[in-house]
From Swiss-Prot:
The lineage of its organism: Eukaryota, Metazoa, Chordata, Craniata, Vertebrata. InterPro entries: G-protein_beta_WD-40_rep, PWP2, Quinoprotein_ADH-like_sf, SSU_processome_Utp12, WD40/YVTN_repeat-like_dom_sf, WD40_repeat_CS, WD40_rpt. One of its GO terms (molecular function) is RNA binding. Belongs to the WD repeat PWP2 family. Part of the small subunit (SSU) processome, composed of more than 70 proteins and the RNA chaperone small nucleolar RNA (snoRNA) U3. PANTHER family: PERIODIC TRYPTOPHAN PROTEIN 2 HOMOLOG, WD40 REPEAT PROTEIN. Keywords: Nucleus, Phosphoprotein, Repeat, WD repeat. The keyword Membrane does not apply. It comes from Homo sapiens. One of its GO terms (cellular component) is Pwp2p-containing subcomplex of 90S preribosome. The modification Phosphoserine is found at residues 898, 902. Residues 240-251, 890-900 have a biased composition (Acidic residues). This is Periodic tryptophan protein 2 homolog.
Length: 919
């Protein structure tokens, strides 16, 4: 089994905090999620998280005008220069302070960051290699409080900065003679956003109390004059012109510009002047909501403003005409962005973790996604590996598509936290348990709750399991220590299993038999035979409280995680322990900021809380109260690999040792909330609360893994963590993993065999090299008529390799029919031999089924749409023929008009209709 799993995608979290950005083509939204960045492709309906992470939560993202580079800045002031083309980090930089916003100039040559009460302009990194990608050009002083927002003119000559001191500052990007800085007032609250007009120095400023000021400049952008150098600077410029090798030194030299709110009279003569044209108020009706975010589209003069109540307004400037107003959320709108065409508007709500894209002309949603409000607790893969269902403490059950990364259905029937989720064997029914005392079954065809199972006395369910046939549903109680068994078809309670003396922590059915394993805090695991009248079969005694239990896919082994950080393996037939793993040293727990003891002593109370066997049963995945997920080899009982699921220092218990410089006689300085002034007052957290709402918007959640599952295909695994739903998958592009390689197998020999039309030998050598492009070249060189001959001569060992390659190729290749022919011939000619090894081949077959099913779903929609259109065309033609027979005296113009109408109804009205659609 391969262990080269890498981070693939982040689901369950669509927006945390920070600014949203549209890509230059306007089809994708870049959203910060924790310490990562996710790109939502709205055109292709797909989300993808970049394989990089910052040290703290992302605070702001700046996108270059060409869309190739992005600057990602976290809460600690660390910046990453990221290439969005190759999805890799190019440069690290530390701004030595908290950065509020970052913005590239429209020409892409410079960018400005607002840090503290200053603004700094840097030379943007170019296309050539540089030792220092960020070179400081100028530092602008002037505001007395924190700077909040930036906007550039279209020609990149000037930029405007808003501040919390209620002032707006216009700075020149160059040393202009008539504009170095200009301070504007007129507001009574902090500036939220400021924007320049298109091809003008006129600007708009918006404050937090809902006031818009329009400022007119008496000078056009072309009227700005460069200040001639004098004194030693003129001599320096002359020397640099003579010496070509020192040409770039002036650009590396930092310049400081200090602005004054009330400059002297002699400084105003011959300078640019601003005057206020108008002042508008958003809160006219007495609904005094704070303005929290704004965006302005310069070409269409469209202003979008978001408020703390979840309402947004669309205005047309400069007349300030209200286009429409809408409430999209119950929480404050944290960020607003408009795409390049001005059609789509993106909203981010940090309170609920919502991301919405609104098309204002048609008044419809392009994207509407929301993660779990509280932490996710449980997850389960569908049998084909295409869907993932998650349950959270917020009582919601969400179903995610692993291919697109989007949630397509949310069930809200539970009134309390969800504790367990599972799929039935068919993959169309989801069964969940909750603390509200119900177990519910949801239908994924009609998206409804069709069964609700309850107990005779109200109880809180902590776990749920469904047998292989999907007929028996069982759930464990947390307070009555009982296990309830229901029938899926009738919904009736079949039996109540008693015997445990502590809360039930886990349930699992044997995949091959109707045997139920239950783990409890009473230090036992009990095996129950569902077809036996006495029910109980065996009792396995443990050395500590049981926290998780799982069966191997073939049902021949049972794994149990206990409170003393051990994983024990049992033979369920003979009730004999076959092995154990000591995992305390592999957890590597951290020290929380409120802990009075060291991480070494705190590790005695930490353990694995989630277990899952791999698809082949040779290894087991374990995670729990730690930032690490471990893969153990079951037979050898050794650690194979350990994955660090997060490096986000904004979470608690990430580091083993606390920072001694923050430890004082009054306590830890890290516990003081630095951002408390940004919200309305300070919310005090409830004492003793470990998860949930915490009563405070400012808290550091503890890093932990609540659930783990391997995909049935065996190529990826998922984990529900404090960060969200993380998916790790095998990346074969960067891994050279040959199979039975010797010195005679080279790419040259493969191509030589192809030239000699020895296709079987070429395919075998390509499979031994295990290079995907070489295998693709060898398979696609086989003529269609010789596929059956080549497949019949392949050894059985290599048939599995070809099937695995075909399953992965279905996701990216356009040769659908060709690869389907290969799959059909392989399964028909080698089906009987493959059936004898069904257990080991099951992940490959499920991976193949998942890939083919996706193509079937896509093509069936298109074919159904064409089929219905053809039926409609036939019905219209029959109706027109009947009309002609009844009214033969109709004119030719009427007949042509009726034909045109029918064609327009079908969406094929010729060139004129296409021009109308384009217009």
């Amino acid at each position: 089994m391969k262990f080269a799993y890498r981070f693939s995608n982040l689901l369950g979290t669509v927006y945390r905090r920070g600014n949203l950005n549209f890509t230059c083509d306007g089809n994708s939204v870049i959203s910060p999620v924790g310490n990562r960045v996710t790109v939502f492709d709205l055109k292709n309906n797909k989300s993808d998280t970049l394989p990089l992470a910052t040290r703290y939560n992302v605070k702001c993202v700046g996108l270059s005008p060409d869309g190739r580079l992005a600057i990602i800045v976290d809460e600690g002031g660390d910046a990453l220069l990221v290439s969005l083309v190759c999805r890799s980090v190019l440069h690290h930089f530390h701004f030595k302070g908290s950065v509020h916003s970052v913005s590239f100039s429209p020409d892409g040559r410079k960018f400005v960051v607002t840090k503290g009460n200053i603004a700094q302009m840097y030379h943007a990194p170019g296309k050539k290699r540089e030792f220092n990608a960020f070179v400081l050009d100028k530092t602008y002083f002037g505001p007395y409080d924190e700077t909040t927002c930036i906007d550039w003119t279209d020609d990149s000559r000037c930029f405007v900065v808003g501040s919390k001191d209620m002032s707006t500052w216009v700075f020149g990007a160059e040393r202009w003679d008539n504009l170095i800085y200009y301070a504007l007032g007129g507001h009574k609250d902090a500036i939220v956003a400021c924007f320049f007009e298109s091809n003008s120095l006129d600007l708009y400023s918006l404050s937090q109390d809902g006031v818009l000021c329009m400022w007119q400049c008496d000078t056009p952008p072309e009227g700005l004059r460069l200040k001639p150098p004098a004194g030693w600077k003129a001599d320096l410029l002359q020397r640099e012109e003579e010496e070509e090798e020192e040409e770039d030194q002036e650009g590396d030299r930092e310049t400081t510009i200090r602005g004054k709110a009330t400059p002297a009279e002699e400084e105003k003569t011959g300078k640019v002047k601003y005057s206020r044209l108008a002042k508008y108020f958003f809160n006219k009706e007495g609904d005094f909501n704070n303005l929290t975010a704004a965006a302005f589209h310069k070409k269409s003069h469209l202003l979008v403003t978001g408020f703390a109540s979840g309402i947004f307004h669309l205005h047309e400037l400069p007349e300030f005409n209200l286009i429409h107003s809408l409430s999209i959320s119950d929480q404050s709108i944290a960020s607003v962005a408009i795409n390049s065409s001005g059609d789509w508007i993106a909203f981010g709500c940090s309170g609920l973790g919502q991301l919405l894209v609104w098309e204002w002309q048609s008044e419809s949603y392009v994207l509407k996604q929301q993660g779990h409000f509280n932490s996710m607790v449980a997850l389960a893969y569908s049998p084909d590996g295409q869907y993932i269902v998650t349950g959270g403490d917020d009582g919601k059950v969400k179903v995610w598509n692993t291919l697109s990364g989007f949630c397509f259905v949310t069930f809200t029937e539970h009134s309390s936290g969800v504790t367990g989720v599972t799929f039935t064997a068919t993959g169309y029914v989801v069964v969940t348990s909750s603390m509200d005392g119900t177990v519910r079954a949801f239908d994924l065809h009609r998206y409804r709750n069709f069964r609700t199972f309850t107990s005779p006395r109200p109880t809180q369910f902590s776990c749920v399991a469904v047998d292989a046939s999907g007929e028996i549903v069982s759930a464990g109680a947390q307070d009555s220590f009982e296990i309830f068994v229901w029938s899926m078809q009738t919904g009736r309670l079949l039996d109540v299993l008693s015997g445990h003396e502590g809360p039930i922590s886990g349930l699992c059915f044997n995949p091959m038999k109707s045997v139920l394993a239950s783990a409890s805090w009473d230090k036992t695991v009990r095996l129950w035979d569902m077809f036996d009248s006495w029910r109980t079969k065996e009792t396995l005694a443990l050395t500590s409280d049981a926290l998780a239990v799982t069966f191997r896919p073939d049902g021949a082994e049972l794994a149990v995680a206990t409170l003393n950080s051990q994983i024990t393996f049992w033979d369920p037939e003979n009730a004999v322990q076959t092995g154990s793993i000591e995992g305390r040293h592999d957890l590597k727990t951290g020290r929380k900021e409120l802990d009075k003891i060291t991480a070494k002593h705190a590790a005695k109370g930490k353990a694995f809380t989630a277990l899952c066997y791999s698809a082949d049963g040779h290894s087991i995945l374990a995670g729990g109260m730690s930032k690490f997920v471990c893969i153990y080899h079951v037979r050898e009982q050794i650690l194979m690999k350990r994955f660090e699921i997060s490096c986000n220092l904004s979470l608690d218990a990430m580091e083993e040792f606390l920072n001694r410089r923050k430890m004082t006689e009054f306590g830890n300085l890290a516990l003081i909330d630095q951002d408390a002034g940004q919200e309305d007052g300070v919310a005090i957290p409830l004492p003793g609360v470990r998860k949930g709402d915490m009563s405070s918007r400012h808290f550091k959640p503890e890093i932990r893994v609540t659930s783990l599952r391997f995909s049935p295909t065996g190529r990826c695994w998922a984990a529900t963590t404090t960060e969200g739903l993380l998916i790790y998958s095998l990346d074969t592009r960067v891994l050279f993993d040959p199979f039975e390689l010797d010195t005679s197998v080279t790419p040259g020999r493969v191509r030589e065999a192809l030239r000699q039309q020895d296709f079987t030998r070429a395919i075998l050598m390509a499979l031994r090299l295990n290079e995907s492009k070489l295998v693709q070249e060898a398979l696609e060189a086989v003529p269609r008529g010789e596929i059956e001959v080549v497949t019949s001569s392949l050894p059985e060992l290599y048939v599995e390799k070809v099937l695995e390659f075909l399953a992965s190729s279905f996701e990216v290749s356009r040769h659908l029919e060709f690869y389907l022919l290969w799959t059909h011939k392989l399964l028909m000619l080698h089906g009987q031999k493959l059936k004898s090894r069904a257990g080991t081949l099951l992940p490959v077959i499920q991976f193949l089924q998942k890939s083919i099913q996706r193509h079937l779903d896509d093509l069936s929609k298109l074919c159904s749409w064409n089929h219905y259109n053809m039926q409609y065309a036939l019905a219209v033609s029959k109706q027109r023929g009947t009309k002609r027979s009844l009214d033969p005296l109709g004119s030719e113009e009427e007949a042509e008009a009726s034909e045109d109408d029918s064609l327009h109804l079908l969406g094929g009205g010729g060139r004129d209709s296409e021009e109308e659609m384009l217009a």
